[in-house]
């Protein structure tokens, strides 16, 4: 049996752009992607802390160090510039792999620079 587990998480990213006329996706600073082991074209779930919206799309890498978090296409309808979002990727793991898997989690500051890297998500963690 395989279980779907969180593999990477970008916590408290601030939306820098929303481009309705682009052909879908989310553009993410590639330095952030590297820190959480996310790849171009990988499916991600985005949760908007401001309005509760949950959407899925795929990743386009942005300029490293730019701090870009841009929702494109229809996804742009679910955010405003300045909204705080959580971006998560998932992987399929066997039961044995799932028991030892540790997702990569980063917490960003208000300019989308990595503020801290968490080794794993603890229950009831408040940032």
Curated annotation (Swiss-Prot):
Cofactor note: Binds 1 pyruvoyl group covalently per subunit.
Active-site residue list: 25, 58
UniProtKB keywords: Autocatalytic cleavage, Cytoplasm, Decarboxylase, Lyase, Pantothenate biosynthesis, Pyruvate, Schiff base, Zymogen
Signal sequence residues: none
Subcellular location: Cytoplasm
Pfam families xref list: Asp_decarbox
Annotated binding of substrate, by residue: 57, 73-75
Main localization (coarse): cytoplasm
InterPro entries, per the entry: Asp_de-COase-like_dom_sf, Asp_decarbox
GO biological process, one term: pantothenate biosynthetic process
A GO molecular-function annotation: aspartate 1-decarboxylase activity
Pyruvic acid (Ser) modified-residue sites: 25
Recorded superkingdom: Bacteria
UniProt-listed Gene3D superfamilies: 2.40.40.20
Keyword rRNA-binding: no
Cofactor(s) it depends on: pyruvate
Pathway: Cofactor biosynthesis; (R)-pantothenate biosynthesis; beta-alanine from L-aspartate: step 1/1
Family as reported in the entry's similarity comment: Belongs to the PanD family.
Function: Catalyzes the pyruvoyl-dependent decarboxylation of aspartate to produce beta-alanine.
Quaternary structure, from the entry: Heterooctamer of four alpha and four beta subunits.
Name listed for the protein in its UniProt record: Aspartate 1-decarboxylase
Species of the source: Listeria monocytogenes serovar 1/2a (strain ATCC BAA-679 / EGD-e)
């Amino acid at each position: 049996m395989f279980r779907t587990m969180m593999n990477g998480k970008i916590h408290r990213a601030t939306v820098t752009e929303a481009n309705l006329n682009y052909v879908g996706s989310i553009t993410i600073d590639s330095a952030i992607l590297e820190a959480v082991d996310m790849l171009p074209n990988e499916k991600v779930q985005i949760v908007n802390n401001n309005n509760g919206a949950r959407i899925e799309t795929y990743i386009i890498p942005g300029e490293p160090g730019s701090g870009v978090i841009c929702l494109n296409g229809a996804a742009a309808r679910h955010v405003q510039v300045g909204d705080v979002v959580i971006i998560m990727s998932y992987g399929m793991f066997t039961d044995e792999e799932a028991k030892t898997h540790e997702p990569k989690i980063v917490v960003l500051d208000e300019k989308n620079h990595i503020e801290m890297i968490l080794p794993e998500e603890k229950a009831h963690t408040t940032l």
